Amino acid sequence: MAKKITGYIKLQIPAGKANPSPPIGPALGQHGVNIMEFCKAFNAKTQGDEGTITPVVITVYADRSFSFITKVPPMSVLIKKAVGIESGSSVPNKNKVGTLTAEQVKEIAVKKMPDMNAASLEAAMRTVEGTARSMGVEIV
């Protein structure tokens, strides 16, 4: 028989830097999960991408065990990494902070596709372009 699920926890944690302090500790603690066990498993799984914010969905079972799935980093993080900027523009329509090529847009769309609900690569690329525009990044 399958384990009974008691809850899901969604967090965004920097890869390789999970520790028991807030927000991770309290979120897992209220579900009775072994916090250190999760931190060690998460840090081991995300070892290669140090510092990149990684969304994770933790499934908590009735016997207080857990499993987790790491997802692709948020689109804004991927765009900032591709352009090489620290943050987006505060006034995206007036101040442009960088440029993205069509090839970079396609690369980000392909990487993000598993977590998106876009039907095609073209639709995913349009989503990436829209996010980039709202951050003040120009598409070339």
Curated annotation (Swiss-Prot):
GO BP term (any one): translation
GO cellular component: a single term: cytosolic large ribosomal subunit
Pfam families per UniProt: Ribosomal_L11, Ribosomal_L11_N
SMART domains listed in its UniProt record: RL11 (SM00649)
Post-translational events: One or more lysine residues are methylated.
Matching InterPro entries: Ribosomal_uL11, Ribosomal_uL11_bac-typ, Ribosomal_uL11_C, Ribosomal_uL11_C_sf, Ribosomal_uL11_N, Ribosomal_uL11_N_sf
Keywords of the record: Methylation, Ribonucleoprotein, Ribosomal protein, RNA-binding, rRNA-binding
GO molecular function annotations of the record: large ribosomal subunit rRNA binding; structural constituent of ribosome
Gene3D superfamilies: Ribosomal protein L11, C-terminal domain, Ribosomal protein L11/L12, N-terminal domain
Family statement: Belongs to the universal ribosomal protein uL11 family.
Function of the molecule: Forms part of the ribosomal stalk which helps the ribosome interact with GTP-bound translation factors.
Subunit: Part of the ribosomal stalk of the 50S ribosomal subunit. Interacts with L10 and the large rRNA to form the base of the stalk. L10 forms an elongated spine to which L12 dimers bind in a sequential fashion forming a multimeric L10(L12)X complex.
Entries under HAMAP family matching the protein: Ribosomal_uL11
UniProt-recorded name of the protein: Large ribosomal subunit protein uL11
